[in-house]
Amino acid sequence: VARQIDFGAVSTPFDSLPAAEAVAVHPIQDTFVCGRRFISYKHRTLDLSVLGELPLICLEGDTSTRRYMDAFLEQNHASVHPEFELATSDMIVQFALRNLGVGCVVRDFALPHLQSGKLFELRFNKIIPKREICIVRNTKNPMSTAAKNLWTIIENAQQKKENTL
């Protein structure tokens, strides 16, 4: 018997199925980070087209983050050709720390280095829309007892969070 997963974590936007139920659990912000090599860009508000002139470090093309950023940049007429396409966001941060280029990552991955001042974020005249990490399940598939309990905890935590806003 083929076993289905109970639920998974995905980032928005995603193609939803009719039987899918999603709970947004964490907002995420995509950003471009770099080190001292690019200090001349630090206090400037840039046009997104500048990214076409910089050595970009991005995730590989088959990720939802990469597809999202490619679509955002295309909508804003910014043509980019990454210098490096890496498998993980952690690797992108490490390349940016070594001044090998400007990394495109979810801000959470670079946060410790942004707070320490080892990296800084580029600022643009267009705001990159925030996204969400969601827990998604197929309502047609029965969940195990443990999965049901965890799903309830996730839903309750999210409702509590929404009520405090």
Regions found by a protein language model. Name each.
Residues 40-41, 55-76, 143-147, 151, ...:
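Secondary-structure junction motif
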Residues 120-162:
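A late-sequence structural motif
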Residues 1-30, 34, 97, 122:
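Short beta-strand-centered segments that line the small-molecule binding cleft or hinge
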Residues 14-15, 38, 65, 91, ...:
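Alpha-helix capping/helix-boundary segments
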Residues 1-4, 11, 70-121:
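Hydrophobic hinge/microswitch elements
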Residues 19-57, 61:
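Flexible hinge/capping segments at coil-to-helix
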Residues 12-13, 36, 107-109, 125-126, ...:
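Short secondary-structure boundary segments
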